[in-house]
A protein has these predicted regions:
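A glycine-rich beta-strand to alpha-helix segment
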Residues: 101-120
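Active-site-proximal alpha-helix that buttresses catalytic centers in soluble enzyme cores
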Residues: 2-81, 85, 113, 132
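Short phosphate-binding loop-to-helix
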Residues: 81-99
């Protein structure tokens, strides 16, 4: 693996009475996905492995950033433990899944993405806001 891209899900919709896993995106979330998609297309080829939280907002973030790219052949894995994983679980998942892939995307949640970013780099952001790509 030469690139690891961490994406916190886009801004979620808090209207309605739905459980946390079923919350979708709000208007701001959809808009930021369009911006992120355009910017990523300028900088990288389409990633060849996606590890995504089972939360609806994470799945919608993936769909709205990557599904309009030209290449439709994805290695997409919805990983149940990305919803409430520990740093150790994420590191084990990366070690077991990423061999043979050049660019891997994880779409998930804080605080774990923030912890992983700090574990892998010393120049990370202080806080990972929604839909930040690092």
């Amino acid at each position: 693996m030469s690139k690891l891209i961490l994406i916190r899900h886009a801004k979620s919709d808090w209207s309605g009475n739905v459980n946390d896993l079923q919350r979708g995106l709000n208007k701001r979330g959809y808009n930021s996905c369009r911006v992120i998609s355009k910017e990523l297309k300028k900088r990288i080829n389409k990633p060849d492995l996606f590890l995504i939280s089972p939360a609806l907002r994470a799945k919608l973030t993936y769909e709205n950033i990557f599904l309009n790219w030209d290449d439709k052949d994805n290695n997409l894995f919805v990983e149940e433990d990305l919803y409430n994983a520990s740093l150790e679980q994420i590191e084990k998942k990366l070690a077991s899944k990423v061999l043979g892939f050049s660019t891997v995307v994880i779409i998930g949640h804080n605080p774990i993405l923030n912890l992983l970013m700090y574990e892998l780099t010393t120049n990370g952001h202080n806080k990972l806001p929604t839909n930040l790509v690092t």
